[in-house]
């Protein structure tokens, strides 16, 4: 099986063309491939499939390193767009794809950045899903013997965003896994720790569902900005500084899609016998 290794700000992926290759990934195989000592090593596996709808170009599938399939990965979406052009699967700059729970438009810019229409953030608890009686801008949660104030949003996948004074000292390693599997998130969640530097600049660390802390989380950056705007903390255009680098997020508010712009890097091509 041929594959490519790619990354978006250090969030790394194994990307496989299932348009011209016949492939099947069991959870066990994915876990073996994800092992950084015995396999290829990655945060997520991205699979390019033929479209299910003639109006679309491809179907986009995402698997975490633990073998679980998820519906969204923003950094992966940028790498997906770069991959299909590099491999000659399309020469379009506007690439329309379906995911497990919707559709996306990926735009490759002239300077090889990728702009992703991530859709409109959904704050309804049932959409996340999150157990709550009604939608609130801020929720109170109990976790690890602490009272946590957080915002909750779906970007096609579940996110919880906590504001912290300093991301460098935030309890990502301890609080992240506790909140990820909190009973109020029946499908688990990605946990973002957000430091507001200015109204147009945040710092962010994300503990990803099924992957742990990563160098960058695209949908997590989108979620943090959406929650920050909803809570009145941020402007419509925000620079997000992650451990792996920078993303630019723009959202005009309810009724509008959110846009993420950032790099996608091709590292190498490989071949593996399964």
UniProtKB/Swiss-Prot annotation:
Similarity annotation: Belongs to the diaminopimelate epimerase family.
Q: What is the E.C. number?
A: 5.1.1.7
Pfam family of the protein (one): DAP_epimerase
**What GO CC annotations are associated with the protein?**
cytosol
Instruction: Name the enzyme's class.
Output: isomerase
Q: What is its main location?
A: cytoplasm
A GO biological process this protein is involved in? lysine biosynthetic process via diaminopimelate
Query: What protein name does the entry list?
Result: Diaminopimelate epimerase
Q: Which reaction does it catalyse?
A: (2S,6S)-2,6-diaminopimelate = meso-2,6-diaminopimelate
Q: Site Could be important to modulate the pK values of the two catalytic cysteine residues: give positions.
A: 159, 208
HAMAP family recorded: DAP_epimerase
**What keywords tag this UniProt record?**
Amino-acid biosynthesis, Cytoplasm, Isomerase, Lysine biosynthesis
What this protein is reported to do is described as:
Catalyzes the stereoinversion of LL-2,6-diaminopimelate (L,L-DAP) to meso-diaminopimelate (meso-DAP), a precursor of L-lysine and an essential component of the bacterial peptidoglycan.
**Listed pathway(s):** Amino-acid biosynthesis; L-lysine biosynthesis via DAP pathway; DL-2,6-diaminopimelate from LL-2,6-diaminopimelate: step 1/1
Subcellular localization is given as: Cytoplasm
Q: Where is the active site?
A: 73, 217
The residues the record assigns to binding substrate are 11, 44, 64, 74-75, 157, 190, 208-209, 218-219
* Gene Ontology molecular function terms on file: diaminopimelate epimerase activity
Please indicate which residues carry the site annotation Important for dimerization: 268
Self-association state and partner proteins as the record states: Homodimer.
What is the organism of origin for this protein? Shigella flexneri serotype 5b (strain 8401)
Q: Which domain of life is it from?
A: Bacteria
């Amino acid at each position: 099986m041929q594959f490519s290794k790619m990354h978006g700000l250090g969030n790394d992926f194994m990307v496989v063309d299932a348009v011209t290759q016949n492939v099947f990934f069991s959870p066990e195989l994915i876990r073996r491939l994800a092992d950084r000592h015995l396999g290829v090593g990655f945060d997520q596996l991205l699979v390019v499939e033929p479209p299910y709808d003639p109006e679309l170009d491809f179907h986009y599938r995402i698997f975490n390193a633990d073998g679980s399939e998820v519906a969204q990965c923003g950094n992966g979406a940028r790498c997906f767009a770069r991959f299909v052009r590099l491999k000659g699967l399309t020469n379009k700059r506007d690439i329309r794809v379906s995911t497990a729970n919707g559709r996306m438009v990926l735009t490759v810019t002239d300077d090889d950045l990728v702009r992703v229409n991530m859709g409109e953030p959904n704050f309804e608890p049932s959409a996340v899903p999150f157990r709550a009686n009604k939608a609130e801008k801020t929720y109170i949660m109990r976790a690890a013997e602490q009272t946590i104030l957080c915002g909750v949003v779906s970007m096609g996948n579940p996110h919880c965003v906590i504001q912290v004074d300093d991301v460098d000292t935030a309890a990502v390693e301890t609080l992240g896994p506790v909140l990820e599997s909190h009973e109020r998130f029946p499908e688990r969640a990605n946990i973002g720790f957000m430091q507001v530097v200015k109204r147009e600049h945040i710092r962010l660390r994300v503990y990803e569902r099924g992957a742990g802390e990563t160098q960058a989380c695209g949908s997590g950056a989108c979620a943090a900005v959406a929650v920050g705007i909803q809570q009145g903390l941020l402007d419509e255009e925000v620079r997000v500084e992650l451990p792996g680098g920078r993303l630019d997020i723009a959202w005009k508010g309810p009724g509008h899609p959110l846009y993420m712009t950032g790099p996608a890097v091709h590292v190498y091509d490989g071949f593996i016998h399964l």
